[in-house]
């Protein structure tokens, strides 16, 4: 049901010209699960896992999304345990019509993975700073690389909007159920609603919404 809701909303938004489907930005965020919540046998949710991000440990799941490069609207949602590597889930987030895929440095090497062997897209993955930090900062090559990375970052920033909407506007910061299936279904519905939220001003401009 949840994927169908997302598909219907996105079909409507695409009809209104709000999703061009020329490129996809992929990203993921951790959704916390209460580590103290246990079932009647005293066990934590076996589908949730612990992961380390920076110097902090988190317990829960990950929401992986694919978003339109122009509008930032979400077209694919995939849920996994928190310890699953982001780069392994990209195939679940693409609609197949994009000509470019944008992602942060955590997705380095994605283009070499077997599942993307015949995928004809331009991979716009953020370069790790270490790949150009040793260059002379006054050189044209360094300045060009910095400018390219800045442009990539501006594009990737759009994928943060739906995460912010579900966490701040909708107050979704922790999983509500046990297991990945139910929580992924709820996340998919929330991202579908976040698309309407993010497109509301443009829809009002088209006379599609009334205040």
Write out the residue ranges for each language-model feature.
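Polybasic low-complexity intrinsically disordered regions
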Residues: 1-122, 128, 188-194, 202, ...
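Residue-level marker of positions within ordered structural domains that often coincide
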Residues: 70, 171, 197
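Helix-centered, glycine/charged polyanion-binding patches within enzymatic domains
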Residues: 99-100, 105-185
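Acidic, contiguous segments within the catalytic cores of piggyBac-derived transposases
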Residues: 143-147, 152-153, 190, 197, ...
């Amino acid at each position: 049901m949840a994927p169908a809701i997302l598909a219907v909303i996105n079909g409507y938004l695409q009809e209104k010209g709000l999703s061009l489907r020329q490129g996809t930005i992929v990203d993921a965020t951790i959704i916390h699960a209460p580590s103290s919540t246990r079932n009647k046998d005293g066990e934590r949710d076996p589908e949730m896992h612990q992961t380390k991000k920076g110097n902090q440990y988190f317990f829960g799941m990950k929401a992986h999304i694919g978003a339109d490069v122009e509008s930032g609207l979400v077209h694919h949602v995939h849920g996994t345990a928190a310890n699953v590597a982001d780069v392994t889930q990209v195939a679940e987030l693409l609609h197949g019509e994009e000509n470019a895929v944008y992602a942060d440095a955590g997705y380095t090497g994605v283009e070499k993975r077997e599942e993307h062997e015949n995928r004809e897209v331009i991979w716009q993955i953020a370069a790790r700073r270490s790949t150009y930090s040793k260059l002379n900062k006054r050189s044209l090559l360094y300045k060009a690389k910095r400018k390219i990375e800045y442009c990539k970052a501006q594009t990737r920033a759009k994928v943060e909007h739906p995460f912010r909407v579900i966490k701040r506007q909708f107050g979704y910061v922790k999983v509500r159920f046990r297991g990945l299936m139910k929580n992924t279904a709820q996340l998919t519905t929330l991202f579908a609603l976040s698309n309407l939220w993010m497109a509301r001003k443009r829809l009002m401009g088209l006379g599609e919404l009334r205040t």
